[in-house]
Design a protein with these regions (language model features):
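N-terminal periplasmic accessory domains that precede
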Residues: 77-80, 97-100, 112, 126-132, ...
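Extracytoplasmic beta-strand/coil segments of soluble accessory domains associated
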Residues: 78-116
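Short acidic/polar hinge/loop motifs at secondary-structure boundaries
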Residues: 116-143, 245
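Periplasmic-side early beta-strands and strand-to-turn transitions of outer-membrane beta-barrels
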Residues: 178, 194-285
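C-terminal beta-signal and adjacent terminal beta-strands/loops
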Residues: 212-215, 520-521, 525-527, 655-730
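Outer membrane beta-barrel strand-and-loop segments of large Gram-negative receptors
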Residues: 357-363, 396, 402-404, 490, ...
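Gram-negative outer-membrane beta-barrel transporters
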Residues: 370, 375, 411-416, 515-518, ...
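Surface-exposed extracellular loop regions of Gram-negative outer-membrane beta-barrel proteins
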Residues: 431-436, 449-497, 516-550, 630-635, ...
């Protein structure tokens, strides 16, 4: 029997057993107390910048809770999002995660940590290993343009990572160690202190993997012989570590101040083979990041909140040479004279890019008469880029200032019925592109307790980055390839529409949302004739091909997201499905015309499934077990083949041990990709997934907390304090 048929048969049996188990549960007598209810109703803050119960938020918000994170036991943020949210797709490589949300890529997704932007990229890809999965309290996902609140980048949506806080008087000590296949190591440590008005939380994380090779076959070009012994890995060996510190001082009941910072380093080890154009690598990739922040929260009265923040971040990307490397060099002052090489020796480091960003913000939430809530603020951002080998002149800068205001209105009518409106405007002033006004409007109509209808219209606005404007990079790959920026680029804009319905009753939650996103003047790299490039570059580099950033694409995405969740006694079930269709008007360089194509990476169908069981065997032992599945149809690309469809299933268990007043012992163990699916597509072609096949993991967490819970009065807006929206579980 073919492998695909065997896989399908096994999956049908698993689903049948799960349905039988669910039916047996339903046959038992039902009572109101049988349904699992949160002791604290879920609250969200990302969509509007103000705190709301999830069921009453005017904008559809997807939440991955702390309990879901613990049950799933994901090894990374990519693992968590792909396993628990079907709208996401990833395709990891050395340049990043290549994340997509509802068809649009990383450049259009804004990632926040406690409301602050994650900064730094390589090739437009954020380094998600900056985020320690063990330090996540919950994840809030808002889809569609959010530029009225967050500015550029938020055309596809916003992911807000809300981290854990030390809220208890006394001492907190936590260690979490996890080991898995391919020498996968995940280490997390935390030390928390809270005495009186002062608190400190220190976090350390370390991650390592030996990487893996799913195939040794390399795609070759032209008439070259196939390569069957390539040394390239599907995922390279890598290590990274980060240490962070957060200090908080409560001046009085009205004012709280904070300061914090992080230091991060990462290295990607690239094996070297014998085929010069394919698997010979003479340098590794290295990253050095740092951040510092300070600010505070002020409550002028019992209802209003003002926050002020100053943030600085640095992201440095460099080559670490592992073998003598002869780099082709040119000396412009001597005209067309060609100098064949410039040597780099082992252990030398060459800076590729050094990005630094400074942001200042002032935000306030004010209660107004007649059920209105005003959220307003001002921001300033300064970007500095140093890339001697990659931008014209070696450096580039950019600045953006913005003011925004949003008003929310609530009106209760009838029995348990609610109308919630939110409208906002953002005025952005960019140093290179002038002013732009972007609006957003959302409405939620609650019809009794179970029914909610939501609608949103919003515009997005994204200015070209300094890299897209000033890029100049030469790459040796079967000849010289020249990549150029374009100072004539226009900002990208979008219009986003969504309409959704929600039904929630007696442990059952069903949510269906349809959306349409139209993006104008998309920026992408296109091949141009050499004569269109600056003559001095053609003389200097003599490229075989020249590519330049241009506004050539208009894109549209349309789709439907469906989520079903049901909780009964100790059981929970979930099903997610995402249907997506995309098209773009793309420049065809070979025929010098526009053509209609699908957006790269699009999968028309994606889904996930989970069922979990939680049971306490007396005061000293509790078990949580879950089966999770994620599926994707074919991912389509214009070049280098399509990514294969797949389905991957996972078993995860957690075991809470002991009955100690101050110490928590938790063991995690599980099997990922239990059906052992591997995509062995040759290197150089697109993959559906990079999974190495069946893998195993085990982990131990020890948490010691000597203190008592204290009440936090600073329920602020989006800035730095989310304690009111988190649960009390460590």
């Amino acid at each position: 029997m073919p492998v695909q048929e065997q896989t399908g048969l096994i999956m049908r049996k698993i689903i049948k057993l799960l349905l039988i188990g669910a039916a047996l549960c339903l046959l038992q007598p039902l009572a109101a107390q049988d349904f699992l209810q949160d002791s604290i109703p879920e609250t969200v803050i990302t969509a509007t910048g103000t705190l709301h119960l999830l069921k009453d938020a005017p904008v559809q918000t997807e939440v991955i809770s702390r309990q879901m994170l613990q049950n799933y036991s994901g090894r990374s943020l990519e693992d968590i999002l792909s396993g628990l949210a079907p709208s996401f797709a990833f395709n990891e490589d050395d340049m990043g995660s290549h994340m997509q949300l509802n068809g649009l890529g990383n450049n259009y997704i804004l990632i926040l940590i406690d409301g602050k932007r994650i900064h730094g990229d390589v090739g437009g890809e954020n380094d998600l290993s900056l985020i320690d999965p063990r330090n996540i309290e919950k994840i809030e996902i808002v889809k569609g343009a959010s530029s009225a609140l967050y500015g550029s980048d938020a055309i596809a949506g916003v992911i807000n990572i809300i981290t854990r806080k030390h809220k208890e008087e006394g001492l907190l000590l936590e260690n979490s160690s996890r080991y898995g296949s391919y020498n996968d190591i995940r280490q997390h440590n935390a030390i928390g202190l809270k005495f009186g008005r002062f608190s400190s939380l220190t976090n350390f994380q370390f991650q390592h993997s030996d990487g893996w090779q799913n195939t040794s076959v390399e795609r070759t070009v032209g008439t070259e012989k196939p390569i069957t012994d390539s040394q390239n890995k599907t995922v390279n060996r890598h290590s990274n570590g980060q240490i962070g510190e957060q200090l908080t001082f409560t001046v009085n009941d009205r004012l709280e101040l904070y300061a914090g910072g992080t230091i991060y380093a990462k290295r990607i080890y690239r094996p070297s083979g014998k085929y010069a154009q394919y698997d010979v690598h003479t340098y590794d990739l290295q990253y050095h990041n740092a951040s510092a922040s300070a600010g505070g929260t002020w409550k002028p009265n019992d209802t209003d909140v003002v926050t002020f923040d100053l943030d600085w971040t640095r992201h440095a990307y460099m080559y670490y040479f592992t073998a003598t490397t002869l780099v082709e060099d040119y000396e412009k002052s001597k005209g067309t004279i060609y100098y064949p090489y410039f040597p780099y020796l082992p252990d030398q480091i060459e800076m590729q890019s050094d990005q630094r960003r400074t942001m200042a913000s002032l935000k306030g939430v004010f209660t107004l008469p007649a059920g209105n809530l005003l959220n307003t603020g001002a921001e300033y951002r300064y970007d500095w880029l140093s890339a001697p080998n990659r931008v014209v002149g070696g450096k580039a800068t950019d600045w953006t200032a913005a003011v925004y205001a949003q008003d929310e209105f609530k009106y209760e009518f009838g029995r348990n019925s609610l109308l919630h409106l939110a409208g906002g405007l953002r005025l952005t002033w960019n140093g290179s592109f002038g002013m732009k006004l972007t609006p957003k409007f959302s409405a939620m109509l609650g019809l009794g307790l179970p029914w909610r209808i939501r609608a949103t219209w919003s515009q997005g606005f994204k200015t070209p980055t300094p890299k897209e404007l000033e890029y100049r990079y030469v790459k040796q790959m079967s000849g010289t390839y020249l990549y150029l920026g374009n100072t004539a680029l226009r900002p990208q804009t979008s219009n986003y529409f969504s309409l959704g319905g929600e039904y929630t009753h007696a442990g059952l939650s069903i949510n269906v949302t349809g959306y349409y996103n139209s993006v104008k003047d998309m920026i992408t790299l296109v091949t141009i004739p050499n004569y269109q490039a600056p003559a001095e570059y053609i003389i200097q580099y003599d490229p075989v091909k020249t590519r330049q950033y241009q506004n050539v694409d208009d894109a549209r995405t349309i789709g439907v997201d469906v989520s079903v969740r049901y909780s009964l006694r100790e059981w929970a079930f979930g099903l997610g499905y995402s249907w997506l269709d995309t098209d773009a008007n793309q420049y065809d360089s070979s025929h010098d015309r526009m053509r209609n194509v699908i957006i790269d990476g699009t999968a028309h169908h994606k889904g996930n499934f989970f069922t979990t069981w939680n049971h306490r065997f007396g005061p000293a032992y509790k078990i949580s077990a879950g089966i999770y599945g994620r599926m994707s149809s074919t991912r389509f690309y214009q070049d280098d083949g399509n990514g294969k469809g797949y389905q991957i299933w996972r078993i995860s268990t957690t075991h809470d041990l002991g009955n100690f007043e101050r110490t928590v012992w938790r063991i995690e163990a599980g099997v990922d990709n239990i059906l052992n699916y591997v995509d062995r597509t040759p290197h150089g072609l697109h993959l559906g997934t990079t999974t190495p096949g069946r893998t195993f993991y085990i982990g131990l967490t020890v948490n010691f907390n000597s203190g008592r819970k204290v009440r936090n009065t600073f329920n602020s807006t989006i800035s730095n304090n989310y304690n009111s929206s988190t649960n009390d579980e460590n």
